[in-house]
Amino acid sequence: KKITTLLSSSTVAMESNWGDFIKSDDTYAEYSAWHYTNIEGGVTRQQFDSLALLQSRGALVYRVGYLIDELKANPNDTMKLKLLIHLVEDLHCPMHMGRPENRGGNSIKIRWFGKETNLHALWDEALIESQGLSYTEYADYLHRTHAAKPLLFDKKMIVDWAWGTYQVTERVYAATDKTVKSYNYIYEFKSVLDESLVRGANHLASVLND
């Protein structure tokens, strides 16, 4: 109820892309590095934990925790609430936990159903759009096929969530060559995509309910 009031006539779903929309406004340029954390492939969990919170790698993991603390201190900060909603989603997008040498997949060019794109855009947009469903239809499908499982939130969970995304990222990089066969790629990764979206939704609910 408190969140509904803060977002006025809007909803969590409607505001979830606000963090991307503001990228076109130079006023918000300082937030550009908040959307990702770049980590090399093949690191151990111990190495990952030491790297994930370094802002020099991109500030995504660090800033999720930062925004949670800020909103506890000032629960009425609508801008930070909208940023938090978006960044928790980014935390569950595989290529936002990508490798620095290819800018999270942005410089890996691929062909997708005959059109040129890149690995980052594939996982941000194209793979979802290839389902041929509206966002409402897709959300309804996920709601019907996956149980809501929000957890009692603990701030230590943030790095655990990031590590889970990193595991998916490793699989995505290992299968880059398979993108040329678009339908086969969808078949292989659809369940991975679904699980990532559901994890993100459950974890966002945990944060917002805290």
Positions of predicted regions on the chain:
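N-terminal, motif-rich segments that launch catalysis or mediate targeting to/interaction with membranes
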Residues: 1-85, 99-210
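Histidine-centered catalytic micro-motifs
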Residues: 86-97
